[in-house]
Design a protein with these regions (language model features):
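Start-transfer (signal-anchor) and selected internal transmembrane alpha helices
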Residues: 1-26, 124, 294-301, 363-365
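Extracytoplasmic catalytic/substrate-binding loops of multi-pass membrane glycan-assembly enzymes
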Residues: 29-44, 56-85, 368, 390, ...
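Juxtamembrane segments of multi-pass membrane glycosylation machinery
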Residues: 49-58, 69-107, 144
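Transmembrane-helix motifs of polytopic, lipid-linked glycan transferases
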Residues: 102-126
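Membrane-interface alpha helices of multi-pass inner-membrane proteins
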Residues: 130-131, 135-140, 157, 162, ...
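Short acidic/glycine- and proline-prone juxtamembrane loop motifs at membrane-interface regions
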Residues: 141-152, 187, 387-391
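Hydrophobic/aromatic-rich transmembrane helices and adjacent perimembrane loops
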Residues: 151, 262-277, 328-358, 378, ...
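Membrane-lumen/periplasm interface segments of specific transmembrane helices
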Residues: 181-332, 430-447
Length: 448
């Protein structure tokens, strides 16, 4: 096992302390947000705790691996055992509710800590990237709640660790971890195919585009990734048995659709969660290289035209507007569906990311980054629902890729991905519903 430096160990200890503190905060009060899926997740977990394996909530869309793992933890803790199925379905267990919820969240924290530890082994003591990984806002919030993201990210990172970092040849182990990754979230089927895709593109782009070389090597690729081919086959069988749907429940709400507007939402999402990205635009304005500036303007105009074209493929779920507390509602009504605001946003995004294209075009011409772009597009451009959680896998994979790359551009780009603690404090913590309640109660207690 790789040696972990003292600074990295210290950061890991601080992370554990932060998780313990935030777990205390989130469990100080029993109130759960109106838009939270946690009650559904807890109910399903309690059904498994009491061996009701055939019951599955129709509102849950993912495979049940997260709830199975959480139920195992609750059983070991002797919590939730002996509750009647009818009581679980009707939520008639309010007296012990907070105990079950709290222990289920502990399981999520354990999964998150394992993920962070594995990531720390892979990044070779790149503490900047480790802090970014930990503080990444949308994932950070779900790290101590009962959500599928914790299991999904864990097995995706674990699969990458064994497949590419440790170069394990045990196909059964890789098949097992890859399967667990897909069983935690269906869209992970795209990300475990990242490596076969990269291999195919490396052969295809060898010296020049040559499909004959690719076809000649296709059986070698299948042999190398036979475990992935088997998982893909099982997933295809599931897809057709499941009436051509990727999800378990709410099939009508998650019909695969071409949704290129997700690219716009993804770019805006990056801008919102990584405020340092904005400095790149400032640097480009200050740059005195006229040739580079002309290239930047050219790239920005092309990007603006593309983003406008993508906006034609906008899909909006009606229930977003029916729920006044849904965060996407404010984005749609306040920015995206107001023509002037949307144009201003697209112009800004175009010039900002145009500067990145100008500086890092050499980097993103590499096969692994082309593969990353393809997997990203596949993972969220077939989904009608705009959900920031769907972007997490792509961001984490990008962190891994730039860490593995020794190019000057990669090292520089890693600094732009650094999500500083100012953003962590003022953005992430404000989204945690318990903090507001705690501050209000403390203020009332001491002032009044």
């Amino acid at each position: 096992m790789e040696k972990i430096e003292f600074q990295t160990k210290l950061i890991l200890i601080i992370i554990i302390i932060i998780y313990i503190f935030l777990h205390y905060l989130t469990n100080s009060y029993s109130k759960v947000p109106d838009q939270s899926d946690e009650p559904y997740h807890l109910n399903q977990t309690l059904l498994y705790v009491n061996n009701y394996w055939k019951s599955y909530n129709k509102q849950l869309t993912t495979f049940p691996l997260t709830f199975i793992l959480t139920s195992i933890y609750l059983k070991l803790r002797r919590h939730g055992i002996g509750i009647n199925k009818k009581d679980i379905t009707n939520k008639i267990y309010r007296k012990e509710y907070q105990i079950y919820l709290s222990d289920g969240r502990v399981c999520s924290i354990i999964l998150s800590l394992i993920t962070i530890f594995i990531f720390s082994l892979m990044i070779k003591n790149n503490n900047l990237l480790l802090i970014t990984f930990f503080t990444f806002p949308i994932k950070f919030i779900y790290s101590f709640l009962i959500y599928t993201e914790n299991t999904s990210i864990l097995f995706m990172i674990l699969y990458y660790y064994f497949e590419e970092y440790k170069k394990v040849n045990n196909k059964f182990l890789l098949f097992f971890i890859g399967l667990l990754s897909v069983l935690s979230r269906q869209l992970n089927i795209i990300w475990i195919n990242f490596f076969p895709l990269m291999n195919c593109l490396e052969i295809l782009f060898y010296k020049k585009i040559n499909f004959n070389i690719l076809f000649d090597n296709i059986f070698d690729i299948l042999k190398k990734y036979i475990h992935i081919a088997l998982i893909d086959s099982l997933f295809i069988i599931f897809f057709f048995i499941n009436k051509c749907s990727f999800v378990i429940g709410e099939k009508n709400e998650h019909i695969p659709k071409i949704h290129f507007a997700q690219i716009i939402h993804f770019l805006f999402y990056l801008l919102w969660h990584f405020p340092f990205l904005n400095f790149k635009l400032y640097e480009m304005f200050k740059n005195k290289d006229k040739k580079k500036k002309r290239q930047w303007i050219k790239n920005s105009i092309i990007l603006f035209l593309l983003l406008n074209f993508f906006s034609l493929f906008t899909i909006t779920r009606r229930n977003i507007f029916e729920h006044p507390k849904h965060y996407n509602r404010y984005y749609y009504l306040g920015i995206y569906y107001k023509r002037i605001n949307r144009i201003i946003m697209l112009i800004y995004l175009s010039f900002l990311y145009g500067s990145f294209i100008t500086d890092y075009l050499k980097l993103f011409k590499k096969v692994k980054f082309i593969s990353w772009i393809i997997c990203n597009l596949l993972s969220f451009c077939i989904e009608g629902l705009v959900e920031p959680r769907y972007f997490i896998n792509g961001i984490y994979m990008l962190m891994i890729l730039i860490n593995d790359d020794n190019e000057k551009e990669s090292k520089e780009l890693s600094y732009y991905l650094y999500d500083n603690y100012v953003n962590f404090i003022f953005q992430s913590l404000q989204d945690i519903y318990m903090v507001h309640n705690l501050v209000t109660k403390l203020f009332n207690a001491y002032v009044y």
